[in-house]
A protein has these predicted regions:
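Elongated scaffold/linker segments in the mid-to-C-terminal portions of large proteins
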Residues: 17-167
Length: 168
């Protein structure tokens, strides 16, 4: 709210407090790109998350089914969520987060998917691989969809702090 209200000094102050008090650390590249736990299992970077279980899971009523292109249930596998080329091209090659999206030249990065390389080769350019089914289980929604859902990550606090300091 402080950012929204233009109270940048307060925004920076409280972002820093959240970073310091949480003890959270940013995700590593290996955590980010892990094909079985990437963005489905809470890490030390996650300050706040939801933890649904298999017992309250439906094949369409779940986060992973709407956001993971690797999952065979839900809508994501049908819509093939992608990033716009102009945005992809704006991300530096040195930023490992860029490779959460399929580069037109698949040899640019050693993409990992539990679905295998043949499946990856068939997918559209710029398709997202950021969110993964739990344990890599893309067939069984009650297993693969029982994923932790990130609500607030420490990386967001660093971005708020940087933006607030820059705007002060």
């Amino acid at each position: 709210v402080y950012m929204w209200d233009g109270q940048f000094a307060k925004a920076a102050e409280y972002a820093r407090k959240a970073i310091d008090k949480s003890g959270a650390t940013p995700m590593s590249e290996s955590q980010w790109h892990n094909p079985t736990t990437g963005f489905n299992t809470a890490t030390s970077a996650w300050m706040w998350y939801l933890h649904p279980t298999a017992s309250n899971m439906g094949n369409l009523a779940n986060f992973i089914g709407h956001i993971s292109n690797e999952a065979d249930w839900g809508y994501a596998s049908l819509s093939k969520l992608q990033m716009a080329r102009s945005l992809y091209d704006a991300i530096p090659a040195t930023d490992f987060r860029k490779y959460s999206y399929l580069d037109p030249d698949r040899s640019t990065y050693a993409y990992q998917s539990v679905r295998g390389n043949a499946w990856l080769d068939e997918q559209p350019d710029y398709m997202s691989l950021k969110f993964r089914p739990v344990g890599g289980d893309y067939n069984t929604y009650s297993v693969g969809a029982a994923a932790d859902i990130p609500v607030m990550r420490v990386e967001e606090m660093y971005l708020i702090e940087a933006e607030a300091v820059g705007a002060s």
